[in-house]
Each structure stands twice: as C-alpha cells, then as structure tokens.
Amino acid sequence: MTGDGIILWEAHRGGGYELPESTPVGFEYAWMLGGTPEADVNATADGRLLSLHDGKLGRTAREIDEETGRTPIAELPYARVRRCDIGSDRYPEQVIPSIDELLAKLRGDVRKEIVIDYKNAPLEQLSELIARFGVAKQLTLATTDEAVAARFRQLQPEVRIKIWLGGAPGEITARFDALAAREFGGFEQVQIHMNDDPERKFWRYALPPDEVRRMLAAAQAKGVLLQALPWQFEREDLFAVLDLGVRSFAVDYPNRFCLLCAEYFAVRTWEKPLR
C-alpha cells in the first residue's frame, strides 16, 4: 500500500478473526489481501510440524471427542490431527496445514511471505524444512524468547527474526529498552503488543503514544522495524497509531485494516490543495 510509505502488515494466526484461524482459506485470504499470514508452529507425536496456535485442539476443532480435544498435540499422531475440521459453518472442512505445505506455497510464488511464530517444535527440524524448500528469504521467525531467536539465527542466517513483547506497559518498555541497549540482538524486527486501556483517558491503548513514538525512533535509528499489534481498533484508533509514524502492523481484522489504511492515505494525499 502506497502513501507516505509502505504498510507492512501481518494477519495474526492466518486469517485473524475474519476467517477461521490457521486454515488454508485463512492463509490464502491474507495473501490475496496483500499481507503476510502468521503460522504458529507445533509438532505432533510422530514429528510432523503443523500450523496451530494452541497446544491442544479443543478450542478450534469442530466435532471432536473431549479426550482428543484436551490431549496435547505433541501426544497425537499427525493422521489424527489431520482428520480434524478447524473451519466454521461458512468455511467447513478446513484441515490444519502442515508447515511443509505452507513452505511449498512460498516456493511456488516468490511474492508470498509468511511469519512463523515459534511455539513447540525442534528448531533444527524447522530449519531443515526451510532449507529443503529454499524459501529462507520469504520467512520471518517470531518469538518472545531471545535464546530461541539466537539459536535460529545460527541455523538460518537469512531468515528475518522478530522479537515480540507483550504484557503490561512497564514490562514492554523495560524489555524494549534492554533490547535496544544490546543493539536489538542483531534481530531485524520488534513487535509491541498494544492492549486496551480500561480508562481510555486520551487514546485507546495502555501503552502511551509518547512511548510508542520513542520506541519507533529508537528502532529506526538502528535500522530495526517496529511493528504494532493493536488487539482492537476502530477508525480513530488506527489513525492515531499511523499518525505516530508506525508503518508495520499485525492485525486480527485484515480486511478492515486494509480499508482503513486506504482511507487514511487517500485523505492525506488530497489534504494539500491541487495546483
């Protein structure tokens, strides 16, 4: 998306809340909107890597027995997990995609990229898959664990690394400042979670705008991309974050986000009088 710069955005858990999360249709939806879907990586009992946020099936799978729903993915064979439908009434019969299926999509189209959020899988196995498909430059590994990030940097130096920071505002700023003091660990991206402020005194989020602006400047000074994840947003909320200069987002509402960004830049493009 053009304007005063490029908007780089990620669809949280694939299709966000607009389509069933971590599904084939959700990933395609994000790609077709021009974004980068996020895939959470977990491993099954027989060693297959797949994209599912939770360590269990109970929340997302439809019509499964209670025992299967509460059993950790790491204790289930891939064939059993693959039989589960994680779609919805509108989008039924959606299977859990394997990581190799998603990487094959990247290999088939160099314009596609993906974010892999590390959950529970052998890093060496994930690295081997990426090498097999030759798609390292189309990938970002996301994690909150700097030790995981450092290890994966050794395994796959061409894969971009993103450290995500969650929690209360004080926790986020403390971790950010510690990262900045270490030159951001040599990693390319930092994501800050923007939780709602229950009081909403002058803007929606608990993290004050001055802090967001300060972190953005610190990241830019070192060539690091700062990404915001606003869990909820309306028009005025997103516009306020864009006004701070943030140009990278992770969102749960991809289509609404794209429409609002188009409006934001369209309005500002025509603010100056024509000559």
PLM segments and residue spans:
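Phosphate-group recognition and catalysis centered on beta-loop-alpha active-site segments
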Residues: 1-275
